[in-house]
């Protein structure tokens, strides 16, 4: 039996930096909410067997009505809602607990990366299916990055060694669960800012695959303006063809 690929779409945050009246995941982009776009991309990727949308309990009725209205509960693959926790890491753990499989591939995706190409999603999933325990999509860094203490520069890492990390990040579910349990039990003196950094701490090699400029995160009004400019020009249908 082939391994299932389950996508966790994180949509439980408030996203206050966007300055919208709704939580960020539900903000429309050309009339289509960000979370709807993200779920559609997972379905279109042709590698995902189930989508779990992680929401805040307060948004249960709204989210259920939204996904129903957009026909996502009657999609070709199952789509369901799971309540998240206070922080993103808590929400991811809630999502992992909702998956019965012990050998699945799990993709963890920010709903705010609403224009992520389905082909990139497939690329991440296939790299995990090929035997890698942790896979992240990355793009080169355009700016020079400085390490600072206070207001003083203390180092300039070589730009050629730096990458910006996107989502979805892909994992062997057993390995990711083990890393989460160890992190919760040991409470190390560092904050795992993404799931890959947790796996790094746990000692799991993390493979990088090519990301995509379209997978940018809609966090600020400027990000939203960029996403709107892209979709106002033309819906990015060219990106909806999964890669080989």
Swiss-Prot record:
Q: List the disulfide bonds.
A: none
Task: Tell me the PANTHER family matching this sequence.
Answer: 2-C-METHYL-D-ERYTHRITOL 4-PHOSPHATE CYTIDYLYLTRANSFERASE, CHLOROPLASTIC
Q: Could you tell me which Pfam families the record lists for this protein?
A: IspD
Q: What is the lineage of its organism?
A: Bacteria, Bacillati, Actinomycetota, Actinomycetes, Mycobacteriales
Its job: Catalyzes the formation of 4-diphosphocytidyl-2-C-methyl-D-erythritol from CTP and 2-C-methyl-D-erythritol 4-phosphate (MEP).
**Which species is this UniProt entry from?**
Corynebacterium diphtheriae (strain ATCC 700971 / NCTC 13129 / Biotype gravis)
Q: Which reaction does it catalyse?
A: 2-C-methyl-D-erythritol 4-phosphate + CTP + H(+) = 4-CDP-2-C-methyl-D-erythritol + diphosphate
Q: Which GO terms describe its biological process?
A: isopentenyl diphosphate biosynthetic process, methylerythritol 4-phosphate pathway
NCBIfam families of this UniProt entry?
ispD
Supply the enzyme class, top level: transferase
Spell out the molecular function terms from Gene Ontology.
2-C-methyl-D-erythritol 4-phosphate cytidylyltransferase activity
Family recorded in the similarity comment: Belongs to the IspD/TarI cytidylyltransferase family. IspD subfamily.
Keyword set includes Coiled coil: no
Question: According to UniProt, where does the site described as Positions MEP for the nucleophilic attack lie?
Answer: 159, 217
Q: Tell me which CDD domains the record gives.
A: CDP-ME_synthetase
EC identifiers of the protein: 2.7.7.60
UniProt-annotated site: Transition state stabilizer, residues: 17, 24
Pathway assignment reads: Isoprenoid biosynthesis; isopentenyl diphosphate biosynthesis via DXP pathway; isopentenyl diphosphate from 1-deoxy-D-xylulose 5-phosphate: step 2/6
Q: What is this protein called?
A: 2-C-methyl-D-erythritol 4-phosphate cytidylyltransferase
Keywords on record: Isoprene biosynthesis, Nucleotidyltransferase, Transferase
Matching InterPro entries: IspD, IspD/TarI, IspD/TarI_cytidylyltransf_bact, ISPD_synthase_CS, Nucleotide-diphossugar_trans
């Amino acid at each position: 039996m082939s391994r299932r690929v389950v996508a966790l779409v994180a949509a439980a945050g408030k996203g206050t930096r966007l300055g919208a009246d709704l939580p960020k995941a539900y903000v429309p982009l050309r009339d289509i909410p960000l979370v709807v776009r993200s779920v559609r991309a997972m379905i279109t990727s042709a590698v995902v067997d189930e989508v779990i949308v992680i929401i805040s309990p307060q948004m249960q009725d709204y989210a259920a009505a939204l996904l129903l209205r957009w026909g996502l509960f009657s999609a070709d693959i199952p789509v369901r809602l799971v309540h998240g926790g206070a922080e993103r890491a808590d929400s991811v753990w809630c999502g992992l607990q909702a998956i019965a499989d012990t050998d699945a591939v799990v993709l963890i995706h920010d709903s705010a990366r609403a224009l992520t190409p389905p082909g990139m999603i497939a690329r991440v999933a296939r790299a995990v299916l090929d035997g890698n325990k942790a896979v992240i999509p990355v793009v080169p860094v355009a700016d020079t990055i400085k390490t600072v203490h206070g207001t003083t520069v203390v180092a300039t890492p070589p730009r050629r060694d730096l990458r910006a990390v996107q989502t979805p990040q892909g994992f062997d579910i057993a390995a990711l669960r083990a890393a989460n349990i160890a992190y919760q039990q040991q409470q190390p003196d560092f904050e795992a800012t993404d799931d890959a950094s947790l796996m790094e701490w746990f000692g799991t090699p993390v493979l990088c695959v090519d990301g995509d400029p379209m997978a940018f995160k809609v966090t600020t009004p400027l990000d939203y303006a960029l996403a709107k400019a892209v979709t106002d020009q033309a819906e990015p249908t060219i990106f909806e063809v999964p890669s080989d």
